[in-house]
Amino acid sequence: MRVGVLGAKGKVGATMVSAVESAADLTLSAEVDAGDPLSTLTETNTEAVIDFTHPDVVMGNLEFLIDNGIHAVVGTTGFTAERVEQVQSWLAKKPSTAVLIAPNFAIGAVLSMHFAKQAAPFFDSAEIIELHHPQKADAPSGTATRTAKLIAEAREGLAPNPDATSTSLPGARGADVDGIPVHAVRLAGLVAHQEVLFGTQGETLTIRHDSLDRTSFVPGVLLAVRRVRERPGLTIGIEPLLNLQ
C-alpha cells in the first residue's frame, strides 16, 4: 500500500515516516507538511494517509482526502461531535472511502480506556488526570475526553460523583466531561500520560498509562493503516481492530 504522512516534519509525523519506511509491506509515497500542497498525495498515487497535523487544519485535510478517495488514519485530536458529523457527511458521498480517527494509538492507552469502562460501574467516584508536553494544542486530551465518555456511559443510571465542594476557584475541580472531572497538566519533559482514579468505600483503584516515547504509537498506527480500507466509512478508535468492544 502506498502511504503518505501529513505533518511529516512534526515529532510524531517524523516517527510515522520512519515507521512506514521500515515496514516491508508499505511504501512511503509522500511526506507533506505545512505549506506543501495536498495535491502531492494524488500526484504520487497515495492510497492511505496518516494525519498527525493540527486541529486547525485537519478538517481541510480530511475533506480533500475523502473527495479524492484516499483512506485516512487520523491521530490529530480536537474532534467535536460537530466535526465528526461533518466527516460522516463527506463520507456519505464517498461510500468506499474509509476514515479512522483515534484519540490514542498506543495499545496500552487503548487497553487502559477499556479497563476504565469495565471498572466504572463498581465505584462511586471517578476522576481523570491527563499529563502532556506543553506543545499540545488541546485540553483536555482526546484520550481523556474519550475515557470520560466511556466511564459516563458505563455509569449510566448510577448516582453522580459525590462532591460537596461549594466554594472553589474557577477550574479548580477540572473540566466536566459528561459528569466526570478531567484535570489537564502541561509540563516540560512529559510525552503523554493519563491516570484514571476510581474510589469507593474503603478502597481506590488507579489505572495509569505512560507513553514514554512517540514510538509507542507506531504499532497501533500501522495496524490501522493496514486495515483501514476494510472498514469503509468512519471508525472511531482502534478498539474494533483489537476486538475490544
Curated annotation (Swiss-Prot):
Its EC number is 1.17.1.8. Pathway: Amino-acid biosynthesis; L-lysine biosynthesis via DAP pathway; (S)-tetrahydrodipicolinate from L-aspartate: step 4/4. HAMAP family: DapB. This is 4-hydroxy-tetrahydrodipicolinate reductase. PANTHER family: 4-HYDROXY-TETRAHYDRODIPICOLINATE REDUCTASE 1, CHLOROPLASTIC-RELATED (PTHR20836:SF0), DIHYDRODIPICOLINATE REDUCTASE (PTHR20836). SUPFAM superfamilies: Glyceraldehyde-3-phosphate dehydrogenase-like, C-terminal domain, NAD(P)-binding Rossmann-fold domains. Keywords: Amino-acid biosynthesis, Cytoplasm, Diaminopimelate biosynthesis, Lysine biosynthesis, NAD, NADP, Oxidoreductase. Transmembrane segments: none annotated. InterPro entries: DapB_C (IPR022663), DapB_N (IPR000846), DapB_N_CS (IPR022664), DHDPR_bac (IPR023940), NAD(P)-bd_dom_sf (IPR036291). The active site is at H132 (proton donor/acceptor), K136 (proton donor). Belongs to the DapB family. GO terms for cellular component: cytosol. Catalyzes the conversion of 4-hydroxy-tetrahydrodipicolinate (HTPA) to tetrahydrodipicolinate. GO terms for molecular function: 4-hydroxy-tetrahydrodipicolinate reductase; NAD binding; NADP binding; oxidoreductase activity, acting on CH or CH2 groups, NAD or NADP as acceptor. One of its GO terms (biological process) is diaminopimelate biosynthetic process. Its main location: cytoplasm. The keyword Cytoplasm applies. (S)-2,3,4,5-tetrahydrodipicolinate binds at H133, G142, T143. Disulfide bonds: none annotated. It is found in: Cytoplasm. NAD(+) binds at G7, A8, K9, G10, K11, V12, G75, T76, T77, A102, P103, N104, F105. The keyword Amino-acid biosynthesis applies.
